[in-house]
Amino acid sequence: NLAEFAHYQLKKDQVALSLIAGTGESLYLRYKDRLDRVLYRIIRLSSEDLAQHIYYSIESAEITFGEAAREYSEGPESKTEGFVGPVDLTTPHPEISSRLKTANPSQLFEPFKAEQWFTIIRLEYRFESEFNDQTKKFLGDLLLGSKSNSIKESLINKYKDYI
């Protein structure tokens, strides 16, 4: 029944919001990497020398990032002119993510090693999350899901001999 479902959703939302009362902002800061989004470009190469050459060519505007990615990148981003995203900051390789966290839009990074690749990245745009009602709901639902799983595991362990 629709009325029962709406009542259930309302109660669930109220419980979720009450769970984050008082700790919402610290929870927000803890999960900020999952809430913020970035749009960036990447070129992956197996040759360090070629990576350096392409980096300097992009930096001096001899070639655009998109042209370089299309022509030289050895990953799937060669089909998108290097574009990746928008993605949260937990999605990219940690070496890439750490640079994107502190980058300014249009900032080009010198080649660095990420796994087997020599990687060139440039942040295009950062979509900053805000601590608003939508974010509070997301965090509350996350916490409620975690608490529900914890309670479920506790009950299973307590009554496993009876199941």
Feature-to-residue mapping (PLM):
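Peptidyl-prolyl cis-trans isomerase
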Residues: 1-163
